[in-house]
Amino acid sequence: MLRLDLQFFASKKGVGSTKNGRDSEAKRLGAKRADGQFVSGGSILYRQRGTKIYPGENVGRGGDDTLYAKVDGTVKFERFGRNRKKVSVYPVA
């Protein structure tokens, strides 16, 4: 009786895995309302991390530093100091 001793070798080289190739979802930060735009109370004006823009008149700051309107009115982005910015909402008379 004839026995064949066949050995099969890999046709492709074994490839290791990489730890790269992932990224987090974009957080959609930035201005949500434009200068001069009319907004209602509770509207989100600016989403940010930290205080890139400070709250001005009739604007509140949420727990995640989001700026929102406290009253109905017109949005105004302003500078104060040498290099700081703030956003205010002025009620329409």
UniProtKB/Swiss-Prot annotation:
Signal peptide span: none
Record has Ribosomal protein as a keyword: yes
Propeptide: 1-9
PROSITE patterns: RIBOSOMAL_L27
Gene3D superfamilies: 2.40.50.100
UniProt PTM: The N-terminus is cleaved by ribosomal processing cysteine protease Prp.
Keyword 4Fe-4S among record annotations: no
GO CC terms of this entry: cytosolic large ribosomal subunit
Keywords from the named record: Ribonucleoprotein, Ribosomal protein
Alphabetical GO biological process terms: translation
Gene Ontology terms for molecular function: structural constituent of ribosome
HAMAP family membership: Ribosomal_bL27 (MF_00539)
UniProt family annotation: Belongs to the bacterial ribosomal protein bL27 family.
Protein name in UniProt: Large ribosomal subunit protein bL27
